[in-house]
Regions:
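Short acidic-glycine-tyrosine-enriched beta hairpin
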Residues: 49-66
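Short strand-connecting beta-turns/loops that link adjacent beta-strands
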Residues: 8, 76-77
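Amphipathic alpha-helical interface segments
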Residues: 62-65, 69, 81-91
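Short beta-strand His + acidic residue motifs that chelate non-heme Fe in jelly-roll/DSBH
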Residues: 25, 46-47, 69-75
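A short glycine-rich, His/Asp/Glu-containing loop-to-beta-strand
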Residues: 1-27, 34, 84-85, 89
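Short, conserved beta-strand element in jelly-roll/cupin
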Residues: 14, 29-46
Length: 91
């Protein structure tokens, strides 16, 4: 669910990821953007290239340089998180 309006300088999106869901992104999806993930409830497993992070409610994670990533819900209930995206440069 898009939270921000088109006039706001960042895209703010609330996501609900059901149990067992996996969402992979190629490295190219992160070119020219900065991204912050904030977990509101549940558990989020974030594979950041070869490194795997287990995030819980209240945790935040700033994504660094572009690399393949996968968002997973390995928990028993829904995971709700917010993604904030800003542009870092013009392609």
């Amino acid at each position: 669910r898009q939270v921000s309006t088109p006039r706001f300088p960042a895209a703010v999106t609330e996501v609900t990821l059901p149990p067992g869901a996996r969402v992979p992104y190629p490295a190219g999806a992160y070119a020219f953007i900065a991204q912050l993930v904030w977990v509101l409830s549940g558990q989020l497993t974030l594979a950041d290239g070869p490194v795997v992070h287990a995030l819980a409610a209240g945790d935040t994670f700033e994504l660094g340089e572009p690399r393949p990533r996968e968002f997973r819900n390995d928990g028993a209930g829904d995971c709700r998180y917010v993604v904030v995206v800003t542009r870092t440069a013009t392609p």
